[in-house]
Every structure is written in structure tokens, then in C-alpha cells.
């Protein structure tokens, strides 16, 4: 037994890795005590398996590729849309086969020219701008060469700025003339009062007649004269007023 225990004791420390630290007694399965070193090990707990990302498909085309969300962490981003044949440079009339409708409604020749509707517009507006290089496209592609010096305008260009001499039209003659304002010296009536009814010619004649009769009355004239005499006596300018005052003193 001692031989077997010695064999087991010799084989056990060899399997344990050596680590720095104080020696300790390790019990064996046979009950023999051998000198060895302690071993510290932390148990590892297995966690949940990580999700496997979906495989990227190499073939993506059309609307499915534009609507399918991108795989991976950049899920907000979307793939670029495919190239479209319909751009701003495409002629929509030819694209939608509307040549017949365009020629039907827009290709009719009018009997009257454009100058009949715009007589005051200078220049030859009946001819297209491509003939005399006055169109907007020709001005953009081939801008006119201008020097540093100013050249006077031609007679055709001056017609747009020229004022035609002649009398003013009737509707514009009295625009700058303001009518004279009547001065109203009468007292303004209050807004609460009702407006007086208009006077008839018979009422005005009756008032004038009554006023004339009052002026022709002899007693009325005599009373007026007496009032004037009394006023003149009491006034300081009257010559008799000073003598009467001195006599009283």
C-alpha cells in the first residue's frame, strides 16, 4: 500500500500546474497527504449565442433593391435608386406620343398677325427670333460683343422710349385740376339732431317779405334812433359827455 500511495502522490503534483504562492497540503483519493500548491480557477458560464447576420444577396435589381433595407448596423440607409430614362432633357411630347394633339391645337395658323394685337411694341415681332438672332437662346449661346464705349440707340430702339406729342385725351385733362372747396361758415349741427328739412321757395319768399315789412315800420325806426342817441351820449367820444361830468363836480 505504501508503494501504491507513493506512486499516486508522485503522479498528482505533476498534473497540477505550478503557481507562485505558499505550499499547501492537497488530499489525494487514496487518503495520503502530499505537499503541493493551491490552484485558483474562475468558472466560465456560457452565454447566449450571437445572432448570425442575414446573408447579403449579390443579385439586387429594380424596385425590390430600392425598397429592401440594408443589412447590418446601417439599417436606416437605403440603396440608391436605379437610373430612370425620364429626365429633364426628354421631350415629353414624343415620350407620351402627343405629336398629333400638339399639331392639332398649337399648329393652326392665325389670320391676324401678332403685331395687330400689340401695335405699340417696337421691332419686328411677327418674324421668329431665330431669323434675326434675337431669341433668348441665341443671346445665351452667342452673347453680343460689346465694347467699352457706349453707342447711341438706333431709331427702331428709340421708339419704345419716345413720347408722342399731341393733346391730352379727354379723360386725362381734368385729372390735375382740383375743384375749389366751399367754406362752410355755418355752425355744425350735432350728430344727434335730425337734419332740417329743405326750404321751399314759398317759405323763403315769405321770410323776405316779413323782414321787409319790419324795416318799413315807422315805430321800429324811431326806437332804433333813440337807442343810437343814448349810446352816443354815454360814449366818451361824445363832446357833451365831458361838460356834463364837469358840471356835476
UniProtKB/Swiss-Prot annotation:
Localization of this protein: Nucleus
Q: Where is the composition biased (Basic residues)?
A: 179-190, 221-233
Q: Name one GO molecular function term.
A: transcription coregulator activity
- Quick one: where's region Disordered? 1-68, 178-249
Ranges of biased composition (kind: Low complexity): 9-18
Superkingdom as given in the UniProt entry: Eukaryota
Q: Example GO biological process term? A: regulation of transcription by RNA polymerase II
Family designation: Belongs to the Mediator complex subunit 19 family.
Q: Tell me the PANTHER family matching this sequence.
A: LUNG CANCER METASTASIS-RELATED LCMR1 PROTEIN (PTHR22536), MEDIATOR OF RNA POLYMERASE II TRANSCRIPTION SUBUNIT 19 (PTHR22536:SF1)
Binding partners and assembly: Component of the Mediator complex.
Name under which the protein is recorded: Mediator of RNA polymerase II transcription subunit 19
| Protein species of origin | Xenopus tropicalis (Western clawed frog)
Amino acid at each position: 500500500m505504501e508503494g501504491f500511495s507513493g506512486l499516486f502522490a508522485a503522479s498528482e503534483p505533476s498534473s497540477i500546474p505550478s503557481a507562485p504562492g505558499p505550499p499547501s497540503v492537497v488530499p489525494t483519493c487514496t487518503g495520503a497527504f502530499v505537499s503541493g500548491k493551491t490552484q485558483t480557477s474562475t468558472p466560465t458560464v456560457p452565454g447566449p449565442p450571437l445572432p448570425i447576420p442575414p446573408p447579403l444577396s449579390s443579385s439586387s435589381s429594380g424596385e425590390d433593391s430600392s425598397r429592401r433595407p440594408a443589412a447590418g448596423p446601417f439599417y436606416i440607409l437605403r440603396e440608391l435608386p436605379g437610373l430612370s430614362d425620364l429626365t429633364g432633357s426628354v421631350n415629353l411630347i414624343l415620350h407620351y406620343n402627343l405629336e398629333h394633339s400638339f399639331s392639332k391645337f398649337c399648329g393652326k395658323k392665325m389670320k391676324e398677325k401678332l403685331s395687330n394685337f400689340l401695335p405699340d411694341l417696337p421691332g419686328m415681332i411677327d418674324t421668329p427670333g431665330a431669323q434675326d438672332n434675337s431669341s433668348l437662346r441665341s443671346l445665351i449661346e452667342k452673347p453680343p460683343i460689346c465694347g467699352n464705349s457706349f453707342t447711341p440707340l438706333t431709331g427702331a430702339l428709340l421708339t419704345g422710349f419716345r413720347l408722342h406729342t399731341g393733346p391730352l385725351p379727354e379723360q386725362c385733362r381734368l385729372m390735375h385740376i382740383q375743384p375749389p372747396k366751399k367754406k362752410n361758415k355755418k355752425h355744425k349741427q350735432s350728430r344727434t339732431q335730425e337734419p332740417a328739412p329743405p326750404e321751399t321757395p314759398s317759405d323763403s319768399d315769405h321770410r323776405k317779405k316779413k323782414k321787409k315789412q319790419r324795416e318799413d315800420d315807422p315805430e321800429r325806426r324811431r326806437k332804433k334812433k333813440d337807442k343810437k342817441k343814448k349810446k352816443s351820449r354815454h360814449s366818451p367820444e361824445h363832446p357833451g359827455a365831458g361838460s356834463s361830468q364837469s358840471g356835476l363836480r
